[in-house]
């Protein structure tokens, strides 16, 4: 069966318009900026501007980590872009999502609020399969709902597996991609301990990530 990409959706540091994001990347614009300036070591990250209220009611946000919020928003934008038929068989719609670590913000909040009442939805909020599950619930997809956790390759693997599923005739519509939301102090400190995050001089955060430069020093979270 022929496979085609019919819609795109992004929530990125360069906005949620795919064309504008691509143009910004082609111009070499950096979205990396300083974060958590109170930490012992300077850190830079690329943050996506995001208004959760655009996609969720206050009640719906209960137990939904930012990583799942981003996934739902991007999936909705992709479905809108595709003009997906409203009468599609739910059992023929699959969700294939990449997520390397899951809901870091939920776990961080639980740790920092250990002496207070623990939110009862903390566990499902930080599970790596939460983004796929929330996308499936939002789109009422009843086909395969799968999560791929393969470090930085997670989203790429998810998209490839989705294409295979369509090609094999397992689904008619595959919502595929990935999300991550790791810019919280605990995760930043953990990556710093591995000495993998890029260093930068004061005022030079935007130039921190230069993977092909001889003086490269690491990457930035986003």
Regions found by a protein language model. Name each.
Residues 1-60:
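ACP-dependent fatty acid/polyketide chain-elongation machinery
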Residues 10, 64, 148:
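Generic anion/oxyanion-binding catalytic loop in active/binding sites
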Residues 16, 27-31, 80-91, 97, ...:
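Acyl-thioester C-C bond-transforming condensing/cleaving domain
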Residues 35-85, 128-142:
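A glycine- and small-residue-enriched flexible loop/hinge segment at structural boundaries
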């Amino acid at each position: 069966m022929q496979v085609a990409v019919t819609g795109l959706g992004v929530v990125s540091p360069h906005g949620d318009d795919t064309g504008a994001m691509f143009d910004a990347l082609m111009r070499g614009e950096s979205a990396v900026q300083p974060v958590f300036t109170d930490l012992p070591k300077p850190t830079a990250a690329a943050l996506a501007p995001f208004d959760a209220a655009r996609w969720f009611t206050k009640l719906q946000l209960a137990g939904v980590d930012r990583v799942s919020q981003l996934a739902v928003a991007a999936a909705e934008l992709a479905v809108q872009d595709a003009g997906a038929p409203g009468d599609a068989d739910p059992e023929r719609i699959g969700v294939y999502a990449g997520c390397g670590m899951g809901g870091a913000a939920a776990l961080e909040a639980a740790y920092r609020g250990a002496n207070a009442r623990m939110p009862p939805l903390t566990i499902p909020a930080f599970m790596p399969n939460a983004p796929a599950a929330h996308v499936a619930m939002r789109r009422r997809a009843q086909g395969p709902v799968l999560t791929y956790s393969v470090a930085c390759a997670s989203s790429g693997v998810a998209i490839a597996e989705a294409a295979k599923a369509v090609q094999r005739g397992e689904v008619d519509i595959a919502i595929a991609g990935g999300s991550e939301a790791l810019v919280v102090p605990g995760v930043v400190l953990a990556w710093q301990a591995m000495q993998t995050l890029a260093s930068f001089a004061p005022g030079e955060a935007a130039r921190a990530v230069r993977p092909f430069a001889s003086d490269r020093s690491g990457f930035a979270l986003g």
